[in-house]
Amino acid sequence: MTAKKIYFASDFHLGAPNYKDSISREKKIVEWLSEIQVDASELYLVGDVFDFWFEWKHAVPKGYVRILGKLAEMCDQGIPIHFFTGNHDLWTFGYLEKEIGLKIHREPVEVNLQNKLFYIGHGDGLGIGDAKYKVPKKVFTNKTCQWLFSRLHPNFSFGLAN
């Protein structure tokens, strides 16, 4: 019997730079997920799976049905999937947890995996310096700013994000 494996991936940036390239990349990612599904004990998605993701109360971004379906299937199969928010997909407010089954992490975590200690996180804004990014990140993660942004129509919001 072969040991189960733990997989890590990040920075798919689905949705960019255009529909054709994104859908092609999404299909390849889903193919890879199907391959690892047979021996995965856990999957860590370490940020920027989507180039832009924002959940409204009654709407989520259109598209991504292939990857979302595959991730839901893997969760239903009992494979824990850890989704670390990145600087492009940090606006998750329950959909990915409730409907897909992902475990959302908004901050880096220390975790012991197979008797080895790992520090896992997307990495954006963690180092000293990088003030040009840390200030906007405070705005992006501010609850009031998120609430205000959620009042914008998704068509306008996506245009603004791009």
Locations of regions flagged by a protein language model:
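Active-site-proximal loop/helix segment associated with metal-binding centers of metalloenzymes
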Residues: 123-162
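Short hydrophobic-aromatic micro-motifs
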Residues: 8, 117-121
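Core catalytic region of metal-dependent phosphoesterases/phosphodiesterases
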Residues: 2-5, 9, 14-113
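Short, intrinsically disordered/low-complexity patches at protein termini
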Residues: 31-32, 69, 116, 143-144, ...
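Short, well-ordered, mixed-charge alpha-helical segments that flank or form enzyme active sites
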Residues: 90-94, 120-121, 127-130
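Detector for Asparagine
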Residues: 18, 87, 112-115, 142, ...
